[in-house]
């Protein structure tokens, strides 16, 4: 996922915030014709697959060319013991512009920290000591905790009951895409919407 981080660095002028999304949790132009909100859980194996396999393809084919605006949403499932903690750290890191780096490492090392419970140790490895101190404080901040809960509430309101779930919006039409995603099918859907 280092390639993704490098691509994001090159895209900084293109990255923009939606009025209801943290700017560091979005990719692409908010003026893109398609908006995809990805509700994911850092302990979810299918979310890991989406992040590591599908997201780079979406970046290349749709986000960089300005066809898709992607918003990352936290949806920690109760069945996953450490996912809410991970979501809190990732959301706190977003306040410092470090969301993608933290998300990348959480997904990359999901099995290890999911078994050990050492979420913080995993997150701290991709932060400077100064950033780590700020993220630890921010993760306890009520505004960060409420941001995670807002994502969860938005997902529940949209009828989401599994991760990953993508809500694809084109104009006034919204299409849920739940579970593990086949990129060729997703691509067909997006290309159909763009016609």
Regions found by a protein language model. Give the residues of each.
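Processing junctions and N-termini across compartments
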Residues: 10, 38-41
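A short beta-strand-turn-helix
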Residues: 18-34, 62
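Short clusters of hydrophobic/aromatic residues that line enzyme substrate/ligand-binding pockets
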Residues: 27, 113, 177
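Conserved S/T- and glycine-rich ATP-binding loop of Class I adenylate-forming
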Residues: 36, 44, 166
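C-terminal cap of thioredoxin/glutaredoxin-like
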Residues: 52-55, 122-195
